[in-house]
Amino acid sequence: MNIGAITDKGLVRKTNQDAIFSKVSPDNKIGLFVIADGMGGHYMGDLASNKIIQEFEQWWLRFEVAEFNKTDSECMDELKEVLNEANSYIYINYSRDKAISGSTIAVLLIYDKKYYMFNVGDTRIYMIDKNGVNLITVDHTLRTELENKTGVTETDIRNNPKRDALTKAVGTKSDISWHETEGMVEGKRFCICTDGIYKFVDDELLKKILVSHSSPQKICDKLVQLVLKAGAYDNYSMYYICPENKKQDGRTSAFCCIALLLIAIILFIIFR
């Protein structure tokens, strides 16, 4: 797999309440990618996001000990249970009086030829393929709820000061539900990012960069440049994943073609 990654506190926040985690199996067939965004300004937001990541790290260690001998459905069942356990721990241990601690989460599991994902909150996963860029997560925000209500206009939503408030997060309630989907990996790339990325970049420009043929890390770096230019007053985190490990840089492909051509010419001269 070819992967780009970045996380930072931004230009204004004193701490980074985002937490990220990724691991790939030795045979390059299984990859787990997780981003958690602690609820900004809330009590113990950084502890919530870090606790989530710790739980998924522990799961991967157990997976390694088992020599990756689990089916994809077994992995997903266990990962969802990990999320349930993290939710219970945060709700019981990090909530004090009326203070609420919580975090968003987006999880992507690449398992051989298939992908699986689930999310809570507004951390997003974009899927990139020959048809363009598609959002495969659901934002659990007031905006989303209002958009699904009849009679509510875009102006109404834009004028609502709480439009970006989360309606779901890990650790804010005793139980938790999530959005999930799955599909085939072939021909697809993925971008996981917090709102510190996508809220600071024009949507059309974001999509243009995501479909570009730059390397995964260059794509991350390009988006971060735009975030910094826009002020970066939130933490930001991102993964860009090419599961099929195909180089996205056209110049690299051209170089390989030229190199092969030169080798062929040399062999022809030697053995003619």
What are these regions (language model features)?
Residues 1-272:
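PP2C/PPM-type serine/threonine phosphatase catalytic domain
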